[in-house]
């Protein structure tokens, strides 16, 4: 077979592509140059073109964890690599390879349909599979890092494809090696390691309350419970623009936690690493009176103070202005700094 027949289909290039439907805040934004990536083989040629033109670049997946400006200059790579397959299986676990552009919730559904439990606590988290490890998404007591075997990516520093084992990913709370080195890696595939000996993880308060009378729920029951809780607490981005949790839960030393607890007996917190506690950012924001408040076209969600929303017509500048007000008030009231979770592009 000749080389022309083996050559990958060229990436589709669109100029001034509207991105309002590709970011969950629903901001009216556009990409100066947008490259649609449907296979890993397209990336070297695209990156060569970007380098030749000396363009800035970034990857955009589901747009669920980003704050977009009016115009994204340079090149935007739209991650649309699909596919999911079980690559190996033994008595202990199954390895599942998933394309970076696959919708995260769709993959969770696929895993349960294929009798591969483990990810049910992460149901309904918006975004793509490729973005999940970058942020190390987590919810209801687990993180995606708990189930990752390795990650395949294009390294823009070496112009080559690499496979990073879990140990090289430096996963931490909402953090990873990929997040620490922005504009370097383009995640094309994530390999998950899902255990055959599944155990329910329902110690998180909201889930524990759901199963007070059922100590041994099945994966599907946990999946449905998580969906129910998230639907009740979090707004649907298709109805009202948002990026889910806007601030990370701050982690403080035990000494600072004890001081805060003395002043605020109802302080909500959770155990973290030895000698540290994780504070509930939503509770801090609520105590400062922001829950349900509106500032122009943006505001704080009425059912969850951790979520900032775009009521329509809002901009990145608007949402960041509101975020700054919240950060300043929380710092003044509690002496705690809140870190923004979405990436500001």
UniProtKB/Swiss-Prot annotation:
<keyword id="KW-0132">Cell division</keyword>
<dbReference type="GO" id="GO:0071949">
    <property type="term" value="F:FAD binding"/>
</dbReference>
<dbReference type="GO" id="GO:0009252">
    <property type="term" value="P:peptidoglycan biosynthetic process"/>
</dbReference>
<keyword id="KW-0560">Oxidoreductase</keyword>
<dbReference type="GO" id="GO:0008360">
    <property type="term" value="P:regulation of cell shape"/>
</dbReference>
<protein>
    <recommendedName>
        <fullName>UDP-N-acetylenolpyruvoylglucosamine reductase</fullName>
        <ecNumber>1.3.1.98</ecNumber>
    </recommendedName>
</protein>
<keyword id="KW-0285">Flavoprotein</keyword>
<dbReference type="InterPro" id="IPR016166">
    <property type="entry name" value="FAD-bd_PCMH"/>
</dbReference>
<dbReference type="InterPro" id="IPR006094">
    <property type="entry name" value="Oxid_FAD_bind_N"/>
</dbReference>
<keyword id="KW-0521">NADP</keyword>
<dbReference type="GO" id="GO:0008762">
    <property type="term" value="F:UDP-N-acetylmuramate dehydrogenase activity"/>
</dbReference>
<keyword id="KW-0573">Peptidoglycan synthesis</keyword>
<keyword id="KW-0131">Cell cycle</keyword>
<comment type="function">
    <text>Cell wall formation.</text>
</comment>
<dbReference type="InterPro" id="IPR036635">
    <property type="entry name" value="MurB_C_sf"/>
</dbReference>
<feature type="active site" description="Proton donor">
    <location>
        <position position="245"/>
    </location>
</feature>
<feature type="active site">
    <location>
        <position position="341"/>
    </location>
</feature>
<keyword id="KW-0963">Cytoplasm</keyword>
<dbReference type="InterPro" id="IPR036318">
    <property type="entry name" value="FAD-bd_PCMH-like_sf"/>
</dbReference>
<feature type="domain" description="FAD-binding PCMH-type">
    <location>
        <begin position="27"/>
        <end position="197"/>
    </location>
</feature>
<keyword id="KW-0961">Cell wall biogenesis/degradation</keyword>
<dbReference type="Pfam" id="PF01565">
    <property type="entry name" value="FAD_binding_4"/>
</dbReference>
<dbReference type="InterPro" id="IPR003170">
    <property type="entry name" value="MurB"/>
</dbReference>
<comment type="similarity">
    <text>Belongs to the MurB family.</text>
</comment>
<keyword id="KW-0274">FAD</keyword>
<dbReference type="Pfam" id="PF02873">
    <property type="entry name" value="MurB_C"/>
</dbReference>
<comment type="pathway">
    <text>Cell wall biogenesis; peptidoglycan biosynthesis.</text>
</comment>
<keyword id="KW-0133">Cell shape</keyword>
<dbReference type="GO" id="GO:0071555">
    <property type="term" value="P:cell wall organization"/>
</dbReference>
<dbReference type="GO" id="GO:0005829">
    <property type="term" value="C:cytosol"/>
</dbReference>
<dbReference type="GO" id="GO:0051301">
    <property type="term" value="P:cell division"/>
</dbReference>
<dbReference type="InterPro" id="IPR011601">
    <property type="entry name" value="MurB_C"/>
</dbReference>
<dbReference type="InterPro" id="IPR016167">
    <property type="entry name" value="FAD-bd_PCMH_sub1"/>
</dbReference>
<feature type="active site">
    <location>
        <position position="174"/>
    </location>
</feature>
<dbReference type="InterPro" id="IPR016169">
    <property type="entry name" value="FAD-bd_PCMH_sub2"/>
</dbReference>
């Amino acid at each position: 077979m000749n080389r022309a027949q083996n050559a990958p289909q060229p990436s589709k290039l669109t100029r001034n592509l509207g991105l309002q439907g590709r970011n969950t805040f629903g901001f009216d934004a556009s990409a100066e140059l947008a490259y649609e990536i449907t296979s890993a083989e397209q990336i070297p040629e695209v990156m060569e073109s970007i380098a030749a033109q000396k363009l800035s670049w970034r990857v955009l997946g589901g747009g669920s964890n980003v704050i977009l400006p009016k115009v994204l200059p340079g090149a935007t790579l739209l991650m649309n690599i699909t596919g999911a397959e079980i690559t190996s299986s033994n008595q202990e676990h199954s390895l599942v390879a998933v394309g970076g552009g696959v919708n995260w919730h769709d993959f969770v559904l696929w895993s349960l349909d294929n009798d591969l439990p483990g990810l049910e606590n992460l149901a309904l988290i918006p975004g793509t599979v490729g973005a999940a490890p970058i942020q190390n998404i987590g919810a209801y007591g687990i993180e995606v890092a708990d189930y990752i075997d390795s990650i395949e990516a294009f390294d823009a520093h070496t112009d080559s494809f690499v496979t990073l084992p879990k140990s090289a990913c430096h996963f931490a709370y909402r953090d990873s090696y990929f997040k620490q080195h922005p504009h370097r890696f383009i995640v094309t595939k994530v390999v998950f390691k899902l255990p055959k000996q599944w155990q329910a993880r329902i110690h998180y308060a909201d889930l524990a309350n759901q199963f007070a009378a059922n100590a041994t729920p099945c994966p599907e029951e946990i999946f449905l419970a998580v969906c129910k809780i998230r639907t009740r607490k979090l707004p649907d981005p298709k109805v009202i623009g948002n990026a889910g949790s806007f601030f990370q839960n701050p982690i403080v030393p035990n000494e600072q936690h004890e001081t805060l607890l003395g002043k605020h007996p109802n302080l909500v917190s959770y155990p973290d690493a030895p000698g540290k506690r994780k504070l509930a950012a939503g509770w801090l924001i609520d105590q400062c009176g922001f829950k349900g408040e509106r500032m122009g076209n943006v505001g704080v969600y009425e059912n969850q103070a951790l979520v900032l929303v775009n009521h329509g017509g809002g901009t990145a500048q608007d949402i960041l202005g509101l975020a700054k007000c919240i950060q300043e008030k929380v710092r003044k009231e509690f002496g705690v700094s809140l870190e923004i979770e979405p990436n500001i592009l």
